[in-house]
Amino acid sequence: MNNTFRYLNGYAMQYGLFLGVWYILVSAAYVGSFAMPILSSFCFFLFLSIPFLIALLTARFRSLVEGEFSFNKGFSFAFLTSLYACVWQALAVYIYLAYIDNGFVFDSFQASLERPEVKEELERSGIMPQIMEITNGGGIESLVDGLRMITPATYTAVIIYFNFIIAPVLSAFVALTLKRRKREVR
């Protein structure tokens, strides 16, 4: 049992690095989408492809395992792969926000919210009054200033927490889809 887990964990670490690079690409496309709006479509595509990529990586691991590939093995592998990927993404986001960004993300976010068509849509949908209420009348600038006050470590923690909520659900679907029963010998 211990060797089986080490084998599974070793491959989860390797594939987690690959998936982590994918997560980092999603984050980079999101940041880049403020300067180049076409990247928002690319970011959306990359984000939606994550469950399929996890399933593909788990299927590749399953092909290396002889005999039964139980739900538990599939779940453990998919969950650990997601966990290791999340660590890489969290590290990259922390380094970016703490040392590289210099306020670009928040300045770009504020600029996009202050565009006339966006302001009009915020008013029409009833979100602007909520922003005014949350910020005690400060508006968009006050909202973005509040986001700036959050430390890079907190954004990193949010990424990890989000992963701990989503990864078990994705892992369960992947494990159910890819489980393989032992074939009976006649």
What is the predicted function of each stretch?
Residues L17-G32, L97-E117, T156-A157:
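Hydrophobic alpha-helical transmembrane segments
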Residues M1-V65:
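Transmembrane alpha-helical insertion/packing segments
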Residues M1-F5, L176-R186:
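Short, charged juxtamembrane terminal tails flanking transmembrane helices
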Residues L64-L83:
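Alpha-helical transmembrane segments with an aromatic anchor "belt"
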Residues F18, W22-V26, Y30, A85-V93, ...:
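Alpha-helical transmembrane segments of multipass membrane proteins
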Residues D145-K182:
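Transmembrane alpha-helical segments in integral membrane proteins
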Residues L80-G103:
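C-terminal halves and exits of single transmembrane alpha-helices
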Residues N102-M149:
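Membrane-interface interhelical loops and short interface/amphipathic helices
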